[in-house]
Amino acid sequence: MNKNLPEDPQLREMVKAALAHQVTRRAVLGGAVATSAAALLAACAPADKPSLTPATDVSDSDPTLIWSNWTGYMDLPNNPTTLDTFKSETGISVTYREDFNDNDEYFGKVKDQLALGKDIGADITCPTSWMAARWINAGYVQTFDDANIPNKKNLQPAYLGEAYDPNRKMSLPYQGILAGFAYDKKAYKDATGKEAPAVLEDLWNPALKGRIGVLSEMRDTVGIVLMDQGVSIGDANSLTEDAFMSAIEVIGQKVTEGQIARIKGNSYTQDLANGDTIVAIAWSGDIMVLNSEAGYDRFGFVLPESGGTISADCFVIPMGATHKKNAEKLMNFYYEPYNAAVLAAYVNYITPVVGAKEEAIKLDPALADNQLIFPTEEFLKLTQGFRALDAKEEQAFAKAFQKIKLGA
């Protein structure tokens, strides 16, 4: 297999979907911010553990919903927002919280409640697919009632067939994510004389010492370093423990030298905005938000020549959620092509909803050429999905990455 193409069959299908001018979905979130090895092992809980009982659903008598999500992942500046439209159409009020900064960090906050089937303070949330798989395998999430999600039929077929949830009974893709290089255009050119970073080595320029940030999401940051070293991160024969530790050594060295100043979750955007960071390993959609807040095209985003990472964040309903039907209605709303298009046009992530591209073009014809929402085959050839890890690998890899984060 061409190592530049995603190994995961879901992501390979995204390429075909792009060729057919269909819409694909987001990705990447990979994982870290300080959680203990014990927490990581708990995330890989055995499938034969005692089953949990879903909480009583009070949706019919209480038209409310709490949604925990990532920062910059909603069209909040729009008037009305899609959340406003959802309320007007359904009567359901959504308390929307941007408190999902990092997969492992969030898991660390809610793992005890999850394990007991208790309320985690959210009726619906959006972990990255690898974390969603852990929750599903551990029995932490509820099974959907598809009768409440008729628009599920609009899911891109590429997202069916996942081993952890083949028929999408417990998870639905929210957005697809790309990770690559975000950079302050003027500051980067002033410091280096170049227009934009192209390869990882560009981040190690002495002129950028102390002005580099990387994501605390292990699969993105380490994945990009691995790809720079010629490793196919979707292939178990290529992404070995030795290869991973070699990439960790590079990152650790740059942290020790002071080249990398920060390892952060979604809060990395603050460092770019205030000028502390000039270049960061970052998520594509965040750059649209940063530029919107800046009021001009201050930041750029590029995939490294060796490639960027791709993955997806997924809707899940925790076992302790008490507004399951309301959460299902929310998913159904965002799987309506027009609503998906409005959201994608703002957040600039890949949408998993069939028909959203056509609706987006009606909103703004220029969106048809936006590679961050509707990537072409050539663009997707520069992306790879991080392969699934077994429990032993997860523990070893996370422990090594955690050690580096503590030193940053």
Describe each model-derived feature in a short phrase.
Residues H21-A27, A38-S59:
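N-terminal twin-arginine translocation
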Residues A282, D286, S292-Y346, L406-A408:
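Extracytoplasmic/periplasmic substrate-recognition and gating elements
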Residues M1-V23, A34-A39:
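N-terminal secretory signal peptides
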Residues A132, R211-E217, T221, V225-Q229, ...:
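Ligand-binding pocket segment of bilobal, Venus flytrap-like solute-binding proteins
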Residues Q270, T376-A408:
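Conserved C-terminal helix/tail region of periplasmic/extracytoplasmic solute-binding proteins
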Residues K118-P127, Q142-Y183, R211:
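A structural signal for short loop-to-beta-strand junctions that line the ligand-binding cleft
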Residues L52, V58-A133:
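Early extracytoplasmic/lumenal segment of secretory-pathway proteins
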Residues I317-L382:
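Mature extracytoplasmic/periplasmic domains
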